[in-house]
From Swiss-Prot:
MF GO annotations: G protein activity; GDP binding; GTP binding; GTPase activity; myosin V binding; protein domain specific binding
A GO term from the CC aspect: melanosome
Disulfide cross-links: 123-188
Keywords from the named record: Acetylation, Disulfide bond, Endosome, Exocytosis, GTP-binding, Hydrolase, Lipoprotein, Lysosome, Membrane, Methylation, Nucleotide-binding, Phosphoprotein, Prenylation
Family label: Belongs to the small GTPase superfamily. Rab family.
One GO term of the biological process aspect: multivesicular body organization
N-acetylserine modification, residue list: 2
Residues annotated to bind GTP: 16-24, 74-78, 133-136, 163-165
Organism: Rattus norvegicus
Subunit structure as annotated in this protein's UniProt entry: Binds SYTL1, SLAC2B, MYRIP, SYTL3, SYTL4 and SYTL5. Interacts with RPH3A and RPH3A. Binds MLPH and SYTL2. Interacts with UNC13D. Does not interact with the BLOC-3 complex (heterodimer of HPS1 and HPS4). Interacts (GDP-bound form preferentially) with DENND10.
CDD domains: Rab27A
Name of the protein: Ras-related protein Rab-27A
Amino acid sequence: MSDGDYDYLIKFLALGDSGVGKTSVLYQYTDGKFNSKFITTVGIDFREKRVVYRANGPDGTVGRGQRIHLQLWDTAGQERFRSLTTAFFRDAMGFLLLFDLTNEQSFLNVRNWISQLQMHAYCENPDIVLCGNKSDLEDQRAVKEEEARELAEKYGIPYFETSAANGTNISQAIEMLLDLIMKRMERCVDKSWIPEGVVRSNGHTSTDQLSEEKEKGLCGC
């Protein structure tokens, strides 16, 4: 896809404590590489990737491909940047929430991050995918998979164990998040929840596009 040749521009936000591997995960997704020497993110950074999204119909058939320009925003996890980070919550449509499988405190802080999202995101029930990162460091694991899955089930969100080092489940986690977002847009009658930054390449907002489609149900917020 060339510049501007897409159907939707969608922003995702990666968040979690400092050092959980947000930058490395996004870099692995966009570039297919692992860099162990990344310095701690200061403020906000982002990466981009073009993908084609195809929804499965109720009969199992694959729908028309939607060309998606993903902006993947990388946030600082340090407390001193928290006010800057939360300012970006409302403009994002989906959230990749990471913790470090070798750091129990980063897992315990997941509840705090979800509380922040419930307060500052576009609605109280935003689309979130939880990722336990650094699954390749099994001998250093401090968080049991059962614990993480139980927490994810409590909040009704998907859970993946990922590795930026070898790429395990990173594409699957982001594709799951995109699928949740696209399905939410399809079923919403009230389009006011959609952040203004979600635009079509022809200059129309996603709200303009969706208002032309058949209304299928209420928004899940």
